[in-house]
Amino acid sequence: MNEQKVNVDFGGRTITIATGKMAKQASGAVMVSCGETMVLVTAVALKSAKEGQDFFPLTVNYQEKAYAGGKIPGGFFKREGRPTENETLTCRFIDRPIRPLFPENFLNDTQIMATVVSADQDNDPGILAMIGASAALEVSDIPFFGPIAGVKVGRVDGKFICNPTAEQLAASDLEVVVAASRDAVIMVEGGAAEISEADLLEAIFFGHASVQPIIDAQIELRKQAGVPKREIAPPAVDEALGAKVKELAYAQMKDAVRIRSKQERHNRISAIADETVAALEADFSGRGAEIKDFLDGFEYELVREHILKDGERIDGRDTKTIRPITSEVGILPRVHGSALFTRGETQALVAATLGTSSDEQRIDSLYGESRKRFMLHYNFPPFSVGETSFRLAPGRREIGHGYLAERALERVLPKHDDFPYTIRIVSDILESNGSSSMASVCGGALSMMDAGVPISAPVAGIAMGLIKEGDDIAILSDILGDEDHLGDMDFKVAGTSTGVTAIQMDIKITGVTREIMGKALEQAKEGRLHILGKMAEALAAPRTDLSPYAPRITTIWVKTDKIRDVIGAGGKNVRGITEATGVSIDIEDTGKINIASTNKEACDKAIKMIRDLTAEAEEGKLYMGTVRKVMDFGAFVEIFPGTDGLVHISELDTERVKDVTDILKEGDKVLVKCIGIDKQGKIKLSRKEALGAVLPE
């Protein structure tokens, strides 16, 4: 097949989607280009599902090749290794909008691989990879209810921007990724600087409108180069078995789904399943999986019906009520800041740690090295849901949840010049029954306030849900885990009392209109304000003092030409200061020096040593110096470390001096006065004019 391509204008730039030239043995393959950024995306699905497969095994991989940016990987092996955090997050951005668009009964192993093969500084390869995933599926024989496309939305000076550059993003008050189909928004994720719900809604639908040309281009490419889709047989449903399961278990399931305790409810539903399978073993041997599928369908139907018709949820709440909330701070005595945030059966233990610039995370990417001073790490141990598992590194879900909570909090952080600390937050989920990432936001804000971080405002998060059957709609505040699983939308919103700082939305159905989203955002705001009020009962504002175990950072400035004097040859001077005082010192090219220590006296001593190294003599001032060298014509006196001045023999005493050694010897301490500095910077000192004077403290 010859190469086929389509070009489309996208936010003032041209995107090209091409197929038929590379990776032709994949089910579908496209090269998506914009500027000098190029991403190869392939889609492959096995010809049949594995025997006994009961879920859709979709895998998405995204990799940024070092050569794409003209770099050679670091490390001993000099090749790409485990995925970076950015690669993991991009995998999730690609996975989430396409996963709901495969047929329910398509269970073949499917893999999407996106490889960045060329990268410039202006065009986001992650967005191109998302577009490429949809396009590769469109031209393949894999059944897929697409196409979809993604866009990053920013706003500068009140104007929305499609796929902003790095420079524009730096000035933008929001950064939101929107994935959408022709008719619907499917996924939203991003952060914002406390913007209003109305502005956020505008941004989402600006994104939806922006992707339409990309969707048109994919449809055109499919016409040019697509192959027929595979025929997928509709799932066989045994009506007789279904009727028998309903007869035995439907009434029991109706009672079970109203049990309010998560563990008791799950245990009861599991027991009903076991009893039903056992009861039907004689007539329907080996059909346990099908029986459980029917029971899952009953649960789905009963929970949704109860909410829509009766307005009552699984745990007895109405649609707007938030679960009981308790917050405690300062519960870990040696930790710089800590909080225990509990909402219903979801609980997060959150710790904040303050560090110096040496603790910043260094990130090596295609675009060079960057540093990160704020980190939030989210951990989801198996005991939080009463399970066991073998845990090594954090999974994609943990990285994604941590990133969302991090974005929610980073907009309220103080400026680095005002609070020069590196901040690490760790959220350990101790119990989980819905919205644990939003519990991490609440606990994260409280832990920072407990640590004395002067955040501009407290932040709270809430997870919203949606049940929709035809025109019947229920928007749910503070959803449970089961409501997330059985509902049509998972909508997480975090923010302050003023506005939204982060959002994550995944929609599983079509027909979620702008009006529904607007209502969900307003209902989320009501819930967020309620949660903020509950948090304020534990701690309303940041503490004014840091923990005694946190480092105190003092900032001083020196002239840039004095930086080398502070560092010394081979780092001798700065190393000597740290060894003598035990402090941590960070020196910036601007002349800014941060001194960190838990001991104030050590910090003061280090500051004095730095001041001595960088001090400059001033005419008319007195100095206590040390005689370093005696000559026939006078003595050289060190008034600062490394800074000498000459006391001429005529300036030693009021009387005539025949021999310098009659007055001074090497190593003597002597009070001198600066009487002049010549054009070459040579310092003239006088002992004579300092006689009888007292050095001010």
UniProtKB/Swiss-Prot annotation:
* Molecular function GO labels: 3'-5'-RNA exonuclease activity; magnesium ion binding; polyribonucleotide nucleotidyltransferase activity; RNA binding
Q: Where does Mg(2+) bind?
A: D484, D490
Its subcellular locations are: Cytoplasm
Cofactor(s), names only, from the UniProt record? Mg(2+)
Which reactions does this protein catalyse? RNA(n+1) + phosphate = RNA(n) + a ribonucleoside 5'-diphosphate
Q: What does this protein do?
A: Involved in mRNA degradation. Catalyzes the phosphorolysis of single-stranded polyribonucleotides processively in the 3'- to 5'-direction.
Q: List the Gene3D superfamilies.
A: GHMP Kinase, N-terminal domain, K Homology domain, type 1, Nucleic acid-binding proteins
GO terms (BP aspect): mRNA catabolic process; RNA processing
HAMAP family (UniProt xref):
PNPase
**KH domain location:** 551-610
Q: What is its EC number?
A: 2.7.7.8
Got a GO cellular component term for this one?
cytosol
The first-level EC class reads transferase
Organism in which the protein naturally occurs: Geobacter metallireducens (strain ATCC 53774 / DSM 7210 / GS-15)
- Which Pfam family name is an example for this entry? PNPase
The name on file for this protein is Polyribonucleotide nucleotidyltransferase
Keywords, in A-Z order: Cytoplasm, Magnesium, Metal-binding, Nucleotidyltransferase, RNA-binding, Transferase
Q: What PROSITE patterns does the database record attribute to this sequence? A: KH_TYPE_1 (PS50084), S1 (PS50126)
Say if the entry is tagged with keyword Cytoplasm: yes
Family listed? Belongs to the polyribonucleotide nucleotidyltransferase family.
Q: Where is the S1 motif domain?
A: 620-688
- The signal peptide annotation in the UniProt record is none
